[in-house]
């Protein structure tokens, strides 16, 4: 477990894996700078600005945009994280939020678990125009093994699976038991494609 940049560098030099405590989603601070500071004091080294839904001050990639990126308070959250020495994690956030955070952050940012949107067009992935900004910021995009983030074939299969579940709900009156039975039968004839380590490396 590492709590500072110096500890991360020391672990790397020793050939060890550095692990950090993270907060996955800015909803955890409930729009409170005091809560953010307390999480940092308790050992949190980074925070993902959003999770699956928007927070009042930042848009998520898997929700309908409300703030068009970061609000003024969202910018202040990024600045406070910079001041505290917490890494700003842009996985889960909308592209507009990515750009706004890169505009205001005075420290390198991370994507803790995302992939390239050019490789797999999942909304959780990072567009090329954002990736092109990382060298100047000094930030990094970290490895993810989520198959629907690295394989377009797996992503499409997930969409089809969801569409089939919707069809079954409409056709069978919406009882969850009948939907699950029909879904299991569909999966048996439409097995989930495999993703590979080569796709992770790409």
Residue ranges and their predicted role:
Residues 1-202:
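Extended, charged catalytic domains and RNA/DNA-binding interfaces, predominantly
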């Amino acid at each position: 477990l590492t709590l500072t940049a110096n500890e991360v560098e020391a672990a790397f030099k020793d050939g060890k894996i550095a692990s950090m405590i993270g907060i996955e989603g800015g909803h955890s601070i409930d729009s409170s700078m005091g809560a953010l500071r307390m999480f940092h004091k308790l050992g949190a080294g980074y925070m993902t600005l959003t999770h699956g839904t928007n927070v009042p001050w930042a848009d998520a990639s898997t929700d309908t945009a409300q703030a068009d990126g970061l609000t003024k308070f969202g910018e202040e959250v990024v600045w406070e994280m910079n001041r505290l020495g917490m890494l700003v994690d842009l996985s889960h956030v909308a592209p507009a939020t990515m750009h706004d955070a890169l505009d205001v952050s005075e420290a390198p940012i991370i994507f803790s678990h995302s992939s390239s949107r050019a490789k797999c067009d999942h909304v959780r992935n990072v567009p090329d125009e954002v990736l092109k900004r990382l060298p100047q910021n000094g930030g990094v995009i970290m490895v993810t093994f989520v198959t629907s983030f690295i394989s377009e074939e797996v992503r499409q299969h997930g969409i089809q699976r969801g569409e089939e579940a919707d069809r079954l709900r409409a056709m069978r009156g919406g009882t969850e038991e009948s939907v699950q039975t029909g879904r299991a039968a569909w999966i048996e004839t439409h097995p989930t494609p495999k993703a590979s380590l080569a796709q992770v490396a790409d």
